[in-house]
Amino acid sequence: MSTDAPTVASEPRGRALDVIRASGLADLGRGALLRVLGRDPVSELLHVVALLLAVIVIRPLLLSDIPVAHYEAPSIVASLILEDIYNLQRAAVFATPLVPRFLFLIVPTLVFYFTRRRLTWDDWEHGRSMRAAVMVVIGMMAWAGATLPYNVYFDQAHLLDRFLLVFFAAATWSTPLAAPFAARLSILLLRQANFPIGQDTFDYRAIADILVVFSAFVWLSHKKSYHPKHFLLLALAVFGSYYYATGVAKWNFGPPYSWLLENRLSNLTASAYAHGWLSFIPERWFMPLLGFARRFDVPMAAFTLFIEYGSLVAFFLRPSLTRIWILLCALLHFGIFLMSGIFFWKWLVTNLALFFWMRRGGGAEVVRAMCRNALNLAFGVAVIYFSFDRIWFSPQIGVAWYDTRFMEHYEIHVVDAKGSKYLMHPKSFAPGEVHWEQGAFCYATVGERSLTSIYGTVYDYDLFKRIEAIREPKEALALYRQAPICDNPQWRNTFDQFMLRFFGNLNRSGGFQHRWLTWIGRPTHIWLQPQGVLYDGQTPVVRVEVWRTLVLHHQNALHRLEHKRVRSLDIR
């Protein structure tokens, strides 16, 4: 019996295999498997994996901060090179490993030189079409870095560094090998805004990551098997990781669905208006428009989540969907600008550069080649999904809050020797103007309280509901009186040192220097139109005053509850 069982069982199985062979299903299955796991798709995946590994290695080099002493020098680059040479000498003497802060850029460049590998845009298939998109991004970052307003705090123009940035950005048109130099220089110049008071780099961080990807792509292109589709896949993954991370943060914030169904995005617009956005529009005209827009809070929140969550997969499914999604992301940034005056112009320009590149010609061929491989979809989704650890990209984690009707608005006023008072426009503190545009410096006061954060935002659901339940202005004041004191001696001392040095330098120089930089300069991240007599360096400053205004958006009107001087600092 045991010897007959296999024979009986094998007959139907054999007939089934014959049927499959006769029907051609085997050939179809084999063809599908080869398309997904064939030699070319797997080779393509290995190229992208190697590119991601290269990004992990070089990203800390291209994006690393440098000590503040280099910004004190007349030339950032010269100071870095001198330090690198000194440290290399010491490393050789003491046999210790060292990675230079700037001269590391020369190593891969020398590899190309000594191996006689002359890299041009024509070395890549559809490289010329890619050049147009890349040059827009590099040119934009070069414009942002090279036209930063004169740094009054450091009292340095860094003109040589600006020239070098423009030079390497322009040289990128001829040779992609100049792109890593332009990327590093633009980041170095932009990072000076973080001293001495740190500020978020979210307005250009994603673009910096894309430049890291392109720099790694350029250096790996010493091997001629790399193609623009490899770069495009990771460039889109950069954007996808940033959008997806913000969507996840909003969805998981507070009680289930609270950000979607209960948060009021129109409150952000009210706070932005009280802060100075669109202040040239009379309040009697603006508030009715805001009341109408309030009806669309939930649809706007739903659209935001749809775009951000969808970025996990939409960039890699089909060429047409890739183009549509990148355009929807641009539309999202334009909507944020209209609602708040917060202008992610670097993101917007990069979105549009990628869209027009992928729209026709060589770029359309590149995105089709990228989407043709199913492994690219799986890998792109995995890169985005696991990016929260910030090993390869730096997506903003926890970008979620509730927008309330109550706002604490801080302004800087200055007084001259005659007692005349002026309002400081936040952009006068450039290149670190974002911190002053946000207008949240309760830390600089003594004994003052703080109920909400930047633009009236809070991170506590119960506090959000309490503010939303306010029925009359006096309830808002009562709630504010219960808020915690925001006294911070360390931050207050940093604020004092900044003001003393900033206005000390300004008084000695007789006003703002190199104003031509602002004439050709880049747009600011936050747009404000403060109303009042603005200070423009017309007279020496003897005192700095911090003023705080409490504002409540109630019954379609802005109630300014308290306008108070909360700090005064003499300029010696």
Stretches with model-predicted labels:
Residues 2-43, 80-88, 115-131:
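Membrane-interfacial, low-structure loops and terminal tails that flank and connect transmembrane helices
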Residues 42-60, 101-109, 127-145, 165, ...:
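Alpha-helical transmembrane segments
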Residues 124-129, 226-234, 364-379:
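Membrane-interfacial entry segments at the cytosolic side of transmembrane helices
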Residues 127-142, 154-190, 237-251, 295-339, ...:
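Functionalized membrane-embedded alpha-helices
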Residues 148-154, 194-205, 337-345:
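Membrane-interface helix caps and helix-loop-helix hairpins in membrane proteins
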Residues 237-246, 367-399:
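Internal/C-terminal transmembrane anchor helices
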Residues 240, 244-306:
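Membrane-interfacial catalytic/cofactor-binding modules of polytopic membrane enzymes
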Residues 403-572:
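Extracytosolic and intramembrane catalytic regions of membrane-associated proteins
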